[in-house]
Amino acid sequence: MAPNLRKSHPLLKMINNSLIDLPTPSNISAWWNFGSLLGLCLVTQILTGLLLATHYTADTTLAFSSVTHTCRNVQYGWLIRNLHANGASFFFICIYLHIGRGLYYGSYLYKETWNTGILLLLTLMATAFVGYVLPWGQMSFWGATVITNLFSAIPYIGQTIVEWAWGGFSVDNPTLTRFFALHFLLPFMIAGLTLIHLTFLHESGSNNPLGLVSNCDKIPFHPYFSLKDTLGFMFMLFLLTTLALFSPNLLGDPENFTPANPLVTPPHIKPEWYFLFAYAILRSIPNKLGGVLALAASVLILFLSPLLHKSKQRTMAFRPFSQFLFWLLIANLLILTWVGSQPVEHPFIIIGQLASLTYFTILLILLPITGALENKMLNY
């Protein structure tokens, strides 16, 4: 019998083992769709980004007008830009839901997969940040100034690092050109990290909602989950195109319709919605260095998840107290996101401080203690 090319060809067999004959737990729910949706987001962003880059000029005098030109004069330029800008929001929605799934179902116990996932999140955040600067509107400029300035809080070398990042003594032309270079490069780094992420995942196989070893009950990825993923693709692309066509500026900042002006500071500098929770944590600490450390800790705390898992059960499916804390954490993050969008005044300052404290308390103290208590309850 002739060998099956799909299984024998050096390249095709890699694709086959990853996407076709991959043994997959039969009971994974729709929460396992977000990995493939993130892949779709990445492909969409790279394609729309390449098309935008062909019409973009990375120069302070021309950047704003080149973006305007793309929207007004390029065939479907407005659509490509709207898809790219809102595609970033969907990228973050998917990655946050993906991380939430990982926390709820104990996927972080696959340590290598989890750690590469956090690196992917950090790279995505860096990509989104440098990308937001490129249209060179007011919020682009001042957002870049405020966030890069945070590095000056690092003792001794901080100011040098900031000036080195800026390529001068303020955010100017050298900053814009290097940010464009980084924004072009980083998505391909994300693509490379994604392959590493998948390699580690396929070493262990997927987790499942019960958190049990599912080797006795696995089915091929294709056609079952390839079809399920396709449904997810259609649903997400429908939502993305709906947003891009009906309300493209819903999630943007009106300040960005004004070209960057170093002499006029916007009344309220704030990042895009997907960074607001971290921005609220940064603002909740009156000390600059303390705020920067809290900001870093808000994301890097995810590295500790495998070490803080004290339960004998992997998932939260049968742990009602941990479930309550998990949803409390989600509500807390939504409060932080809302506070981050508000001005720095009473009562938002105290709400932000309490929400920041609660965020770290739940992750570092309450969840591990609850896990240990639930173990005790299993004995009775």
Swiss-Prot record:
* Cofactor(s) of this protein: heme b
Q: What does this protein do?
A: Component of the ubiquinol-cytochrome c reductase complex (complex III or cytochrome b-c1 complex) that is part of the mitochondrial respiratory chain. The b-c1 complex mediates electron transfer from ubiquinol to cytochrome c. Contributes to the generation of a proton gradient across the mitochondrial membrane that is then used for ATP synthesis.
Which residues are listed for heme b b562 binding in this entry?
A: 84, 183
Which Gene3D superfamilies does the UniProt entry name for this protein?
Cytochrome Bc1 Complex, Chain C (1.20.810.10)
InterPro entries, from UniProt?
Cyt_b/b6_C (IPR005798), Cyt_b/b6_C_sf (IPR036150), Cyt_b/b6_N (IPR005797), Cytb/b6-like_sf (IPR027387), Cytochrome_b (IPR030689), Cytochrome_b_C_euk/bac (IPR048260), Cytochrome_b_N_euk/bac (IPR048259), Di-haem_cyt_TM (IPR016174)
Q: Where does heme b b566 bind?
A: 98, 197
What family does the Swiss-Prot or TrEMBL record give for this protein? Belongs to the cytochrome b family.
User: Main subcellular localization, coarse class?
Assistant: mitochondrion
GO CC entries: mitochondrial inner membrane; respiratory chain complex III
Q: What else is known?
A: Heme 1 (or BL or b562) is low-potential and absorbs at about 562 nm, and heme 2 (or BH or b566) is high-potential and absorbs at about 566 nm.
Key words, A-Z: Electron transport, Heme, Iron, Membrane, Metal-binding, Mitochondrion, Mitochondrion inner membrane, Respiratory chain, Transmembrane, Transmembrane helix, Transport, Ubiquinone
> PROSITE patterns recorded for this chain?
CYTB_CTER (PS51003), CYTB_NTER (PS51002)
Compartments, as annotated in UniProt: Mitochondrion inner membrane
Q: How does it assemble?
A: The cytochrome bc1 complex contains 11 subunits: 3 respiratory subunits (MT-CYB, CYC1 and UQCRFS1), 2 core proteins (UQCRC1 and UQCRC2) and 6 low-molecular weight proteins (UQCRH/QCR6, UQCRB/QCR7, UQCRQ/QCR8, UQCR10/QCR9, UQCR11/QCR10 and a cleavage product of UQCRFS1). This cytochrome bc1 complex then forms a dimer.
Note accompanying the cofactor annotation: Binds 2 heme b groups non-covalently.
Which Gene Ontology BP terms does the record give?
A: mitochondrial electron transport, ubiquinol to cytochrome c
Q: Which GO terms describe its molecular function?
A: metal ion binding; ubiquinol-cytochrome-c reductase activity
Record bears the keyword Oxidoreductase? no
Pfam families cross-referenced by the UniProt entry: Cytochrom_B_C, Cytochrome_B
Protein name (Swiss-Prot/TrEMBL):
Cytochrome b
Which residues bind a ubiquinone per the record? 202
TM segment ranges = 34-54, 78-99, 114-134, 179-199, 227-247, 289-309, 321-341, 348-368
Looking at the record's lineage, which domain of life comes first?
Answer: Eukaryota
Q: Please tell me the species this chain comes from.
A: Garrodia nereis (Grey-backed storm-petrel)
